[in-house]
């Protein structure tokens, strides 16, 4: 799921967060999150829901079926 990896990276960067900060918020290891971003591991369905909720996007947006929302002027 290469588009998922790209979207995770883009969403994290838009928010100015480190991988470690996202991993802590999701209660997973930083290595696991890194593997998601590098397309080395696919998140299970419950984690996909947590990721979408964390970033405030739909599953369709997260998975690339719909475009990601444009960043707001506040850097969102």
Model-derived regions, located:
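Short basic helix-loop element that most often maps to the first helix and adjoining turn
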Residues: 6-25, 50
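Recognition helix of helix-turn-helix/homeodomain-like DNA-binding domains
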Residues: 28-42
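DNA major-groove recognition helix of helix-turn-helix/homeodomain DNA-binding modules
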Residues: 46-61
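Short amphipathic helical patch at the helix-1/turn junction of helix-turn-helix
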Residues: 2, 13-14, 42
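Conserved hydrophobic/aromatic packing and binding residues within compact polymer-binding modules
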Residues: 8, 22-23, 33-36, 62
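Short, charged recognition helix plus adjacent turn
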Residues: 53, 63-76
């Amino acid at each position: 799921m290469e588009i998922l990896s790209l979207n995770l990276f883009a969403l994290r960067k838009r928010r100015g967060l480190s991988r470690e900060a996202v991993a802590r918020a999701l209660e997973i290891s930083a290595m696991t999150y890194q593997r998601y971003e590098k397309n080395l591991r696919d998140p299970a369905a419950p984690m996909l829901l947590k990721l979408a909720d964390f970033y405030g996007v739909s599953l369709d947006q997260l998975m690339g079926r719909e475009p990601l929302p444009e960043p707001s002027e506040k850097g969102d």
